[in-house]
């Protein structure tokens, strides 16, 4: 076979086209038994390719993949096969595994595929594929058909209307193909027609791209038919493969890891076009590779989360704007119209708005408010005044003439002032102190304090001192005094006032404590 020539087997449309080593598929001769009636083809390296001579009777051959050691080993004598309508062709392919394609899934569901194909077609064509990684031979797996599809070469269909299945080979890929007539599939009994329903038509589309060559695997179309001669390819008449759904799953697993490795080496723009794998199984169900999902994700289609975020975002923005404007304007109105200070004229006894009203308008509270500042000082002054009054009382008891000389006009004004202060509700300690400074007020308070000491039993005064009023009544010469009834009335009034003052002072002390 020349480097640019195309040689085909007559009657089968199974031809091979080889080109350069970088773009073509190198064929290595596999040791096979030579029999009569075999023809050989030369590969680019000078090796021979043995072909079966009985390929003329095939009308619609179907390709059935056999994994590794599951190729049938039972040999049927060639004499029995000559001239029979069930002429068969077994193609044994050994391929070096590509580093980028790994098959890990295990499956052995393809043992009966060839017999089912033979049941449907009078002249089936079985292909036996086995993979080798270096010198180590892996266990037969159902996913090795995927490796065969990934490393064998680029498969192009004859008709554009048929399905596609191709693979671009790597530069370092070397493969050997041997077609011999010594290997036959085992004869099997006819199977019931009910079992044929389990195997359905599946369209396999495998697109793999090798980053070293820069060759891009594309769907074949009218514009791409001119590039078929540049690549070595193996074309078959029947582009459909009979595969069960279990083999579909294993093939998907085998191709996933290799495609993921190649995806890391290629730029992102080509990933959505180059690496797309779709498998059609039972009922038209479609399972895609992660790269296909990545290609779909690259399209300008928003994810559901983004859609939800876009739906929620305008609502949130609108609410935020409306709320922000409302509260902002409300705050500005408060700031633009501050509360003006009160312009009322100052009134005594009425507190201005905004100021702490420490003193209430009750009649007894003003004294308490003023005593808040005097506090202990007023109490100390009162004790001193009591002591002075006690001394004056002792002096008055010794001097009886001073008791007779009490002027009535001087004693009346303090009483009237005390009544007025009680009526107005503005009693001051200072007014009492000022009244005590004058002579008349001192005399009146002396009598008041003496009565207070008698009623309350104050211990500050010396014990055993008689009351001054009783002494005044007992003085010799005062019994017939016309002023005695008036003085007694004043004494009664003073006692009443004293009791009132005492109650006020007790309340004040309890308030301070």
UniProtKB/Swiss-Prot annotation:
This is Uncharacterized protein CXorf49 homolog. The lineage of its organism: Eukaryota, Metazoa, Chordata, Craniata, Vertebrata. It comes from Mus musculus (Mouse). The modification Phosphoserine is found at residues 43, 84, 123. It comes from the Eukaryota. It holds the Pfam family DUF4641. Disulfide bonds: none annotated. Residues 37-48 have a biased composition (Polar residues). Keywords: Phosphoprotein. The keyword Transmembrane helix does not apply. PANTHER family: GENE 4779-RELATED (PTHR31866), PTHR31866:SF4. InterPro entries: DUF4641 (IPR027822). Residues 1-48, 210-229, 236-287, 390-414, 453-481 are annotated as: Disordered.
């Amino acid at each position: 076979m020349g480097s640019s020539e195309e040689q085909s087997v007559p009657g089968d449309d199974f031809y091979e086209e080889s080109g350069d080593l970088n773009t073509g598929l190198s064929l290595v001769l596999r040791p096979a038994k030579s029999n009569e009636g075999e023809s050989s083809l030369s590969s680019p390296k000078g090796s021979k390719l043995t072909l079966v001579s009985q390929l003329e009777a095939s009308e619609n051959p179907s390709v059935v993949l056999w994994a590794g050691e599951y190729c049938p080993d039972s040999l049927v004598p060639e004499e029995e096969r000559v001239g029979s309508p069930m002429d068969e062709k077994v193609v044994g392919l050994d391929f070096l595994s590509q580093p980028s394609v790994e098959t890990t899934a295990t499956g052995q569901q393809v043992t009966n595929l060839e017999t089912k194909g033979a049941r449907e077609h009078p002249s089936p064509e079985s292909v036996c594929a086995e993979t080798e990684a270096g010198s180590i031979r892996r266990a037969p797996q159902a996913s090795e058909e995927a490796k065969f599809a990934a490393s064998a070469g680029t498969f192009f269909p004859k008709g554009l209307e048929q399905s596609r299945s191709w693979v671009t080979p790597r530069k370092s890929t070397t493969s050997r193909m041997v077609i011999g007539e010594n290997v036959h599939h085992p004869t099997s009994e006819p199977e019931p027609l009910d079992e044929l329903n389990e195997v359905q038509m599946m369209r396999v589309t495998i697109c793999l791209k090798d980053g070293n060559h820069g060759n891009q695997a594309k769907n074949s179309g009218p514009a791409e038919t001119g590039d078929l001669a540049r690549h070595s390819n193996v074309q078959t008449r029947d582009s459909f493969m009979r595969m069960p759904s279990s083999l579909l799953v294993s093939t998907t697993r085998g191709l996933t890891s290799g495609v993921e490795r190649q995806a890391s080496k290629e730029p992102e723009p080509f990933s959505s076009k180059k690496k797309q794998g779709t498998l059609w199984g039972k009922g038209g169900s479609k399972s895609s590779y992660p790269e296909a999902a990545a290609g779909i994700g690259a399209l300008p289609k928003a994810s559901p989360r983004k859609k939800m975020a876009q739906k929620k975002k305008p609502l949130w923005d609108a609410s935020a704007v409306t709320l922000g404007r409302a509260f902002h304007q409300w705050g500005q109105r408060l700031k633009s119209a501050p509360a003006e200070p009160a312009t009322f004229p100052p009134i005594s006894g009425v507190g201005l708005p905004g100021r702490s009203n420490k003193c209430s308008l009750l009649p007894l509270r003003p004294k308490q408010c003023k005593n808040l500042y005097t506090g202990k000082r007023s109490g100390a002054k009162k004790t001193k005044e009591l002591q002075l009054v006690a001394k004056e009382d002792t002096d008055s008891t010794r001097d009886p003439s001073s008791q007779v000389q009490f002027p009535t006009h001087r004693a009346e004004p303090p009483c009237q002032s005390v009544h007025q202060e009680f009526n107005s509700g503005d009693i001051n300690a200072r007014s009492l102190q000022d009244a005590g400074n004058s002579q008349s007020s001192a005399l009146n308070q002396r009598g008041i304090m003496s009565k207070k000491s008698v009623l309350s039993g104050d211990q500050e005064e010396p014990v055993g001192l008689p009351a001054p009023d009783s002494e005044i009544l007992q003085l010799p010469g005062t019994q017939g005094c016309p002023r005695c009834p008036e003085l007694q009335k004043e004494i009664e009034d003073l006692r009443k006032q004293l009791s009132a003052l005492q109650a006020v002072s007790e309340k004040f002390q309890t308030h301070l404590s």
